[in-house]
């Protein structure tokens, strides 16, 4: 089978190599899937830049989410059957024609979804669900700020917040503002042209924000924290600001950390504000039952039509470098999907 290896850190054009490797064999409690589509996540870009501490050493096959058909099951496997259409998490290894993963990370695909849409619900959908329903509570009337609201996670968070009857502010670049309005965002803010904090203060008559979902980090996080009302929560689940320019080095990570600012527990206590960090890889490793729950609940929402995943663009697997550039340059709306 073919697999796409990250052979060295740096620019996408020279980072990847497609190689042949054996088809994996399912052990007890595992499933082998013939992959139709796999997804790109911003963590893949961070890993390619050499800035993701959880990534294995090179050469490594990246990839967290796939959709395809069950090829084989391990000993005593009774949950899934050969030939079933499934969607699944992978702890790396997703950039391949066949993947092996644990049964708890696999779910049957609804008939209403194609492989690309299913891929868009695995990591992005589960992350959005965990952020919105496990890490915090969204109350009717809450003012919610979602950064990168046109992205794979952001677009699903918008839909979840609107389902809870929240007032939603969303940031995106100029070309994506109409998409945000179509999703139901109450105030779409062009972060490339405007200071989102000033726009929100002017639009809300200085009313504060109850919940922020932030995948950007750095100064965006710091400025978002200043907008929080007493009782407000900021859920941080990414650091896209870490990636900038063409250099790969640890200095950018240090600059990012400094940009977040320094907070003490007493500061949070006195202001009655909360900072909640979300790393879905840690959830997968330490609370796999919660990850499975998130995927099940997202599937229920998709089947009921309360959320609709957006597939922004599909690339063929041999265009992996082009797809990485597309995601890294923030051209994407919704999920970027690769197809074999």
Segment roles from a protein language model:
Residues 22-39, 51-93:
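Glycine-rich beta-strand-centered segment in the early N-terminal region that forms part
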Residues 37, 46, 85-148:
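NAD(P)H dinucleotide-binding glycine-rich loop of Rossmann-like/cofactor-binding domains
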Residues 121, 126-194:
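Mid-domain Rossmann-like dinucleotide-binding core that forms the NAD(H)/NADP(H) cofactor-binding site
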Residues 85, 143, 167, 232-233, ...:
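Short glycine-centered segments of the SAM/dcSAM-binding site in methyltransferase folds
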Residues 219-304, 340:
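Glycine-rich phosphate-binding loop and adjacent beta-alpha segment
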Residues 284-340:
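C-terminal hydrophobic helical "lid"/dimerization subdomain
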Residues 195-207:
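Short amphipathic alpha-helix with an adjacent loop that forms part of the alpha/beta core around
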């Amino acid at each position: 089978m073919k697999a796409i290896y990250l052979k060295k850190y740096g620019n996408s054009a020279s980072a990847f190599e497609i190689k042949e490797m054996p088809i994996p064999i399912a052990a007890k409690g595992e499933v082998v899937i013939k992959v139709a589509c796999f997804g790109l996540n911003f963590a893949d870009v961070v890993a390619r830049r050499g800035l993701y501490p959880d990534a294995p050493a090179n050469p490594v096959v990246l990839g967290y989410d796939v959709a395809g058909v069950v090829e084989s099951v391990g000993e005593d496997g009774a949950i899934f059957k050969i030939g079933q259409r499934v969607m699944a998490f992978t702890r790396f290894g997703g950039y391949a024609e066949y993947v092996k993963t644990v049964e708890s990370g696999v779910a049957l695909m609804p008939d209403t979804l194609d492989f690309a849409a299913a891929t868009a619900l695995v990591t992005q959908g589960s992350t959005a669900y965990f952020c919105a329903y496990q890490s915090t509570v969204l109350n009717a009337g809450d003012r919610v700020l979602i950064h990168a609201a046109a992205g794979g996670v952001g677009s699903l968070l918008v839909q979840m917040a609107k389902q809870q009857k929240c007032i939603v502010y969303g940031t995106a670049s100029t070309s994506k503002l109409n998409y945000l309005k179509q999703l139901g965002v109450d105030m779409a803010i062009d972060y490339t042209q405007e200071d989102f904090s000033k726009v929100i203060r002017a639009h809300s008559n200085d009313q504060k924000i109850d919940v922020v979902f932030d995948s950007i980090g750095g100064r965006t996080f710091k400025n978002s924290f200043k907008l929080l009302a007493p009782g407000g929560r900021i859920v941080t689940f990414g650091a896209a600001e870490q990636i900038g320019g063409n250099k790969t080095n640890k200095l950018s990570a240090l600059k990012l950390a400094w940009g977040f600012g320094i907070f003490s527990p007493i500061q949070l206590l006195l202001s009655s504000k909360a900072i909640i960090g979300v790393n879905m890889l840690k959830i997968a490793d330490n609370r796999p039952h919660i990850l499975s729950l998130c995927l099940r609940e997202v599937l229920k929402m998709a089947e009921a039509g309360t959320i609709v995943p957006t597939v922004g663009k599909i690339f063929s697997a041999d265009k992996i470098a082009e797809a990485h550039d597309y995601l890294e340059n923030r051209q994407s709306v919704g999920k970027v999907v690769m197809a074999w």
